[in-house]
Design a protein with these regions (language model features):
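Short, ligand-facing micro-motifs at secondary-structure edges
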Residues: 2, 20-32, 50-74, 88-93, ...
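A short glycine-rich beta-alpha junction/loop motif
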Residues: 72-77, 109-132, 262-268, 300-323
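Non-catalytic DNA-recognition/assembly elements of restriction-modification systems
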Residues: 1, 123, 127-131, 168-191, ...
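Short amphipathic coiled-coil heptad-repeat segments
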Residues: 143-146, 150-180, 344-362
Length: 362
């Protein structure tokens, strides 16, 4: 269905490639919309239907219909496969194997953007057995997927709890006005790019990792480099700000406090050596949750958005006392450790599923 999306009408839902969750391959109901125009039954998703992305970077992404998802119409960039002679979940599970994604990588290669048409999808070899055996295997995998979905929900709820605690505590506590410049001495870093990374060498952080790898607090360094000449090293308690993005100004406000000394810092970022009058960990939480929109107003640019220290140094902040900052930081660090434990459990469950899929569908 090549229809535009409109506000959800309460009955008819519209599933597009972006509505299929990357992690769970389920329909995400965070932003429900309806298809605009005349609704055609041949685009209605039914039991035993699998939807497959046919073009773009998401080629190969799949979704298996669930009755609980309601009345769904699928968009034109999705292909529907109706599985009637085999267990749909058994077939769907094979679309999450390394074998499948290797096949997608080869089959989707185009001179332009990647894509796979319906005839090509039908050529992917599916392993089958008796319907009774397929149903048993599908039941096991379904239970594991449900557990993974529950684990994702636990992590999501813990993150929401953290945000709520930060915001509610901030609302209730007494605050004093300071400027960004009062927080400590700022510093710039050297040039360091992805090409400078190596398997071994000195621990380092490049600015892109502030978006993709690290959260509010950096306790373990993931990257290394052999480029050491003239580079700036971290001090424990430094607050690191990325200074450019192509997304939006709000997402640019994503600083991290580093709890490790002598780490090479490089790329499009700046830092602040936080004064002992402030808790660097609390400040990281504060900027990521409370002052994000406030500082985003100082960012400049359209295609590439920039933020420099000089843009924000005079910005006014309302902060709790150091005693309150220390108390709050301790609570939030403990909550982050709980999130980390749950994320490790999620990784174990995901690895278990991958192992089972590999053993069953080599």
């Amino acid at each position: 269905m090549n229809a535009a999306a409109k506000t959800y009408d309460g009955v008819n839902k519209y599933i597009r490639i972006t509505d299929i969750d990357e992690a769970t391959s389920t329909y995400t109901d965070k932003d429900i919309v309806s298809p605009d125009g005349v609704l055609k039954d041949n685009y209605l998703v039914n039991d035993c239907d699998i939807l497959l992305a046919r073009t773009g970077a998401s080629t190969g992404k799949s979704y298996l219909y669930k009755k609980s998802d309601g009345k769904l119409y699928y968009a034109g960039f999705l292909i529907r496969a109706n599985v009637t002679t085999h267990d749909p979940y058994f077939v769907f599970s094979q679309l999450h194997t390394h074998r499948y994604w290797r096949w997608v990588s080869i089959m989707s290669a185009r001179s332009g953007q990647p894509g796979i048409n319906s005839q090509e999808y039908s050529s992917f070899p599916i392993y089958t057995t008796s319907i009774k055996e397929e149903s048993k295997i599908a039941k096991l995998l379904s239970l594991l997927d449900d557990r993974i979905a529950t684990q994702n929900k636990i992590i999501e709820d813990l993150k929401k709890l953290k945000s709520a605690i930060i915001e509610e505590y901030y609302r209730q506590t007494e605050k004093n006005e300071v400027c960004v410049a009062d927080l400590g001495n700022h510093f710039n870093v050297g040039n360091l790019a992805k090409d400078d990374l190596s398997e071994t060498g000195k621990p380092c952080i490049i600015y892109g990792e502030l978006f993709t790898t690290y959260g509010e607090i950096i306790s373990q360094i993931e990257s290394h480099t052999n480029k050491t000449g003239g580079m700036i090293l971290s001090k424990k308690g430094d607050l690191l700000f990325p200074s450019s993005t192509t997304v939006d100004a709000v997402s640019l406000i994503a600083p991290s406090v580093i709890n490790v000394d002598n780490v090479i810092l490089g790329g499009d970022m700046f830092g602040i050596h936080i004064s002992h009058n402030y808790n660097a960990q609390y400040l990281s939480y504060y900027f990521n949750h409370i002052a994000k929109k406030q500082l985003a107003k100082f960012a400049k640019g359209s295609t590439i958005i920039h933020l420099h220290y000089t843009d924000i140094e005079k910005a006014k902040l309302l902060l709790p006392s150091l005693e309150e900052q220390n108390r709050m930081a301790k609570c939030l660090v403990a909550l982050d450790k709980k999130v980390s434990v749950e994320q490790n459990l999620l990784s174990s469950l995901t690895c278990q599923k991958s192992y089972l899929l590999q053993q069953m569908f080599i």
